[in-house]
From Swiss-Prot:
Organism, as annotated: Pyrenophora tritici-repentis (strain Pt-1C-BFP)
CC cofactor: heme b
Pfam families linked: peroxidase
Catalysed reactions, semicolon-separated: H2O2 + AH2 = A + 2 H2O; 2 H2O2 = O2 + 2 H2O
Family statement: Belongs to the peroxidase family. Peroxidase/catalase subfamily.
Name listed for the protein in its UniProt record: Catalase-peroxidase
Assembly and interaction partners: Homodimer or homotetramer.
GO cellular component, one term: cytosol
NCBIfam families noted in UniProt: cat_per_HPI (TIGR00198), PRK15061.1 (NF011635)
Function of the molecule: Bifunctional enzyme with both catalase and broad-spectrum peroxidase activity.
Site positions (Transition state stabilizer): 90
Record's subcellular location: Cytoplasm
Species classification: Eukaryota, Fungi, Dikarya, Ascomycota, Pezizomycotina
Placement of covalent cross-link Tryptophyl-tyrosyl-methioninium (Trp-Tyr) (with M-268): 93-242
Length: 760
């Protein structure tokens, strides 16, 4: 070895490291979320069918094993009071509780608590241990039970094991195997921060963000006056599931805390009674943990050494577990029966007066003004404590609306139980979608309004000859094909893959509020629905019946067939919901801000139009190629929401051609913004200066963004005209059937098999 030569072999850096595109261009349009639907990310393979696996599950044996686990305390993580029930309730609650009704994202639907960022949130400290306690059971039952189902079912079993009968349980949540990058959790850069979601929020804390005295070291005597929580967020702080249990920004004001609670739980689709029941019911079990300040804990699981094998927050205080556990920084046991359902939470809340104190970790909490020591110690049977509560607990008494509800429950505990188990069931199942996805022997018979129920099909479905007849009749009904296409799209594209709401089934496009949404062009919609109802009435006078939901989709499909000159698959079986089956207020959250496929809407100062388009495509469960081909096809079909010519880059509108891409990528065009908003653009011939087209940001992004342009170029090629039509038809069918969970598990993709009966 020559002198000066490094004795250590040079090792190159590795893939994925170094300065990334997002470092150079932090505001670039990110299409990575459209790649989350790639089945290659699933180690179980693209043909894995969780529904079929779940049907093989010995459900009773699983519940028996979970019941046994509740009291099988492990030395490496001992059970409080000898029972893991409180821990597992928190695990299930924090899995499902990330759901927000605004965009349907979050929730426990695919087991995201296992991945970043949720697995490292300050509010999820110690849940790494809860999931590890479950691993032997998950390993035993394997593919028959997903992590997503198991975490929530375990919370249910925990309640039952402590004397709280539940409302039921439905399985059917298939696991994902990667972090969901689509969810906007907030713009704060420090744990427990709120300075982005609130106009005058706090910066947050350094270190690992365990909630203790850190967050209110800056003297604040009054709660913040601006509590307008940023949309679509529900949590009050970065890294919390709900609200700050110490009070707004750590200020122990129960009345102010009630405001945050109402906002947060409201955005989870819970009313005041459901909110109060969840807090009271959840806090009837277990305890919080704040044995010492957070300086005693190590990094979160994602930041820890390999030797910890996914564990985080290693605790150097005392034994590091049991009585020395540090989780939230609060040290509260709410009732004298922490492993048994009772009404003692409310009894104590109203029996005692409360005074502020500091936990051993320095957090604000409340202790009863009494000499009674009636609360058991979690690990020493000879020790008793005074009752304690959180600031958010006192809100259940101090807020007038909550106080009215909870005082009644003090005298009528059965009403509390009924409200709690229903709210708990809703919490766990709000993002499950239609009942056709619900699996298992404990699915409740009672149909609930928040399910967005649709009637079950009755009688024989329409067959091939019926479909052919109806296609002819809808095309002869005097409605322009473009209007039929727009209406079918409007009906089906209300679907949200996040919480499986919306879609064409139910024909809710004819009901409030969807019939009045601007994007659905109410005047035109009424015209189309009237014509289709006429066709339906005539057909239904015979022996077979067709739902309006099916007819809306069939009419759009027939119009696409006419424009494409190829057969477009159609699968009947939809039914029509009633207004009474529709929670209009809840459905308001499904109204789109933009729909780039119909060239509708525009961005804001905070979010660009094209970012909203990618967001919409993700909610529709589309890939980038599907987003591109569907947009180009809808433009060629003249399907803009208002019939405008923006982006209709063709001399033959109404025909399914690739003209949109050919003309968008024409080098002879020069585009200029029509005004300072840069939402509308005009395309000029470079030589003559003649204006040829107008376009919006919805259109021009496909020529500007490198990845989207690469796909657009593919469809603009002379040898891909047939591919364009084929891919558009496949994308159309996908949109029309996004909510058809009743058929998705019965067959593979239609495009791989051709049109099989009764699909046409």
């Amino acid at each position: 070895m020559s002198q000066g030569e490094c004795p250590v072999k040079k090792v190159p850096n590795v893939a994925g490291s170094g300065t990334r595109n997002t470092d150079w261009w932090p505001n670039e349009l990110r299409t990575n979320i459209l790649r989350q639907h790639d089945p290659r990310q699933n180690p179980l393979g693209p043909d894995f069918n969780y529904v079929e696996e779940f049907k093989k599950l010995d459900y009773d044996a699983l519940k028996k094993d979970l019941n046994a686990l509740m009291t099988d305390s492990q030395d490496w993580w001992p059970a409080d009071f000898g029972h893991y029930g409180g821990l597992f309730i928190r695990m299930a609650w924090h899995s499902a509780g990330t759901y927000r009704v605004t965009d349907g994202r979050g929730g426990g639907g695919d087991g995201q608590q296992r991945f970043a960022p949720l697995n490292a949130w300050p509010d999820n400290v110690s849940l790494d241990k809860a999931r590890r306690l479950l691993w032997p059971i998950k390993q035993k039952y394997g593919n028959k039970i997903s992590w997503a189902d198991l975490m929530l079912l375990t919370g249910n079993v925990a309640l039952e094991s402590m004397g709280c009968p539940t409302f039921g349980f439905a399985g059917g949540r298939a696991d994902t195997f990667q972090s969901d990058e689509s969810v906007y959790w907030g713009g704060e850069t420090e744990w427990l921060g709120s300075d982005v979601r609130y106009a005058d929020g706090a910066k947050g804390v350094k270190g690992e963000g365990i909630m203790d005295g850190d967050q209110h070291k800056t003297d604040k005597s009054e709660p913040h006056t601006s509590r307008n929580l940023e949309q679509p967020l529900a949590a009050a702080h970065m890294g919390l599931i709900y609200v700050n249990p110490e009070g707004p920004e750590g200020i122990p004001d129960p009345v102010a805390a009630a405001h945050d609670i109402r906002t947060t739980f409201g955005r989870m689709a819970m009313n005041d009674a459901e909110t109060a029941a969840l807090i009271i019911g959840g806090h009837s079990f277990g305890k919080t943990h704040g044995a010492a300040p957070s300086e005693n804990t190590g990094p979160d699981p994602n930041s820890e050494d390999l030797a910890t094998q996914g564990f985080g927050w290693m605790n150097k205080h005392g034994r590091g577990n049991g009585p020395d556990t540090i989780t939230s920084g609060l040290e509260v046991t709410w009732t004298g029966t922490p492993t048994k359902w009772s009404n003692k939470y409310l009894e104590y809340l109203y029996k005692f007066e409360w005074e502020l104190e500091k936990s051993p970790a320095g957090a604000n909490q409340w202790v009863a003004k009494t000499d009674e020591h009636i609360i058991p110690d979690a690990y020493d049977q000879n020790k008793k404590h005074k009752p304690r509560m959180l600031t958010t607990d006192l809100a259940m008494r101090m807020d007038p609306a909550y106080e009215k509800i909870t005082r009644r429950w003090l005298e009528h505990p059965q009403e509390l139980h009924d409200t709690f188990v229903r709210a708990w069931f809703k919490l766990l199942h709000r993002d499950m979608g239609p009942r056709s996805r619900w699996l298992g022997p404990e699915v409740p018979k009672e149909v609930l309004i928040w399910e967005d129920p649709v009637p079950q099909p009755e009688g024989e479905l329409i067959g091939e000859s019926d479909i052919a007849t109806l296609k002819k009749q809808v095309l002869d009904a005097g409605v322009e094909p473009a209007k039929l296409i727009r209406t079918a799209w409007a009906s089906a594209a209300s679907f949200r893959g996040s919480d499986k709401r919306g879609g064409a089934n139910g024909a809710r496009i004819r009901l409030a509020p969807q019939k009045d949404w601007e994007v659905n062009n109410p005047k035109e919609l009424a015209e189309v629905l009237k014509a289709l109802e006429g066709v339906q009435s005539k057909f239904n006078s015979g022996s077979k019946k067709v739902s309006l939901a099916d007819l809306i989709v069939l009419a759009g499909t027939a119009a696409v067939e006419k424009a494409a000159g190829v057969q477009v698959p159609f699968t009947p079986g939809r039914t029509d919901a009633t207004q009474e089956q529709t929670d209009a207020k809840s459905f308001e959250h499904l109204e789109p801000v933009t729909d780039g496929f119909r060239n509708y809407g525009k961005g804001t100062d905070r979010v660009r139009t094209e970012q909203l388009d990618v967001d919409k495509a993700h909610l529709l469960r589309l890939t980038a190629p599907e987003m591109v081909v569907l947009t180009g096809g809808m433009r060629a079909l003249n399907a803009n929401w208002d019939g405008s010519s923006h982006g209709v880059f063709t001399k033959r509108p109404g025909q399914l051609t690739n003209d949109f891409f050919v003309n968008l990528l024409d080098n002879n065009l020069e585009w200029k913004a029509a005004d300072s908003s840069k939402e509308l653009y005009e395309g000029f011939d470079r030589k003559s200066g003649q204006k040829k087209w107008t376009a919006t940001r919805h259109d021009l992004v496909f020529g500007h963004h490198p990845e989207l342009r690469a796909v657009a170029e593919t469809y603009a090629q002379a040898d891909n005209t047939d591919k364009f039509v084929k891919d558009f038809v496949a994308g159309w069918e996908k949109i029309m059937n996004n909510d058809r969970f009743d058929i998705k598990n019965k067959s593979v993709s239609a495009q791989s098999r051709g049109a099989n009966k009764p699909r046409l």
